[in-house]
Amino acid sequence: MNVDEFIMKIKRRETPFYDRLYRIAFAARHFEVPLVRGLHDAGYHERRFRIATWRSFWRAAYYQPIFRSRCARCGKNLHLMNSGQGIPVIEGDLRIVIGDNVTLYDRITLAGLTVGENPTLTIGDNTMIGMPIAIMVGGEVSIGSNCLIGSNLIADNPGHNLDYKRRFQKLVKIVIGKVKIGNYVFAGHQSMIVGNVTIGDGAIVGVNTVVTEDVPPFCIVSGNPARLLKKLPFPKEMIEIVGEKEYQKYLDAKIET
């Protein structure tokens, strides 16, 4: 009788002997030290503190400096949220410009397309980019200041040639637009922003929303494809900041029912 056959006899509990072995193995598998509330609660907090301290050390001493080395410009007070990967994945020859007080999660991808010309990603001051976003840049993607971005994908291009015969050929030109995300924009979790798109200041993109057309400032869009659900109050002080043209877009926007 080989080992596998022996194990199967235990699992099947074929005789009182194998049944006894099964019970012993079951008890051993489910053994744990009894809970001591104060002791184990302290152990939980100790573990959290130890992990946070370890990650903070490596973030400051290693991950943030090497990420900065890949940026054309990186402002002060960059903060990489370390969830285990360390730094964002940077693919291709991407020019990265980052403002002050920017927070990025490490589990994100920033990619410059080889078919693009000088692909550039710009992120404004006080903006937070959550995970697990992929930002695909063929030309230019700009994200304004004071934004919260939880999108799944931001891309100024379709990723591949639309011609099925040329789709798998390397270095084939594709349609490249420009993604411009204004200031104070909130893009919800798993949303997608694709194509030649402008999202106005103060706009909100709902969870799982797919944006393929411009979004007026201070408007809420949701759905696939995105549709206008609500117009937010437009602060008077913002009219001068965004300009009359953008304000007119807000006035002209129609809520879709």
What residue spans do the PLM features occupy?
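Short coil-to-beta microelement around the adenine-binding A-loop and adjacent beta1/P-loop entry
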Residues: 72, 178-179, 197
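Flexible glycine-rich beta->alpha loop in the catalytic core of nucleotide-sugar glycosyltransferases
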Residues: 153, 160, 198, 209-210, ...
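Domain-scale signature associated with acetyltransferase and cell-envelope carbohydrate enzymes
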Residues: 1-157, 182-184, 217, 226-230, ...
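Beta-rich strand-turn-strand
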Residues: 136-140, 190-204, 209-212
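Solenoidal tandem-repeat scaffolds enriched in leucines and small polar residues
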Residues: 174-180, 193
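Conserved hydrophobic/aromatic beta-strand scaffold that supports enzyme active sites
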Residues: 210-212, 220, 228
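Short-chain dehydrogenase/reductase
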Residues: 148, 186, 202-204, 220-222
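Histidine/lysine/aspartate-rich catalytic loop segments that bind and position anionic ligands
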Residues: 144-166, 171-176
